[in-house]
């Protein structure tokens, strides 16, 4: 009733489109934040925020062992955040990334809230923590953070490699 019908590898077309459209839109929001807020840089505080997030995600990952989606989601965030926080060339992008993430959470909150309030998206309680912000599983926010951070990281690294190649 809520999907078009075509499936690829067992997943609805809409699910596959999510993995293309959302990252593209997120990178756009990130670029807009960089352009309009280029003078804002709270790198020290943002790094501290992300280190605290690593700590919180680590604790909750351990506590959620057995709820496999929650565990893998949080553990993946921990690993990638530690990696990103140790790549010195990416540090200058963290402030704008965090701003873009917070802005991108607004439409994500609205759309995801509608999808989870209606019977469009249902979650298997045996693999999720069942902790929700309104109707949205908290894992959706950490998953979105990871998805957006990976895409922005690859985007910035690709730009850097292209510029280095052009200058040589």
Indicate residue ranges for each PLM-predicted region:
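Hydrophobic cores of alpha-helical transmembrane segments in multi-pass inner/ER membrane proteins
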Residues: 17-31, 76-82, 139-155
């Amino acid at each position: 009733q809520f999907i078009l019908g075509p499936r690829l590898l067992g997943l609805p077309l809409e699910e596959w489109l999510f993995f293309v459209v959302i990252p593209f839109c997120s990178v756009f929001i990130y670029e807009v934040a960089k352009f309009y807020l280029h003078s804002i840089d709270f790198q020290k505080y943002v790094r501290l925020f992300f280190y605290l997030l690593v700590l919180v995600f680590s604790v909750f990952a351990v506590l959620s062992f057995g709820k496999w989606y929650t565990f893998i989601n949080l553990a993946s965030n921990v690993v990638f955040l530690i990696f990103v926080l140790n790549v010195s060339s990416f540090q200058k992008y963290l402030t704008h990334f965090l701003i873009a993430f917070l802005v991108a959470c607004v439409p994500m909150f609205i759309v995801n809230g509608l999808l989870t309030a209606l019977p469009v998206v249902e979650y298997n309680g045996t693999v999720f923590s069942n902790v929700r912000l309104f109707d949205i599983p908290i894992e959706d926010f950490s998953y979105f953070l990871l998805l957006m951070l990976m895409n922005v990281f690859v985007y910035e690294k690709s730009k850097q490699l292209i510029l280095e190649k052009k200058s040589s």
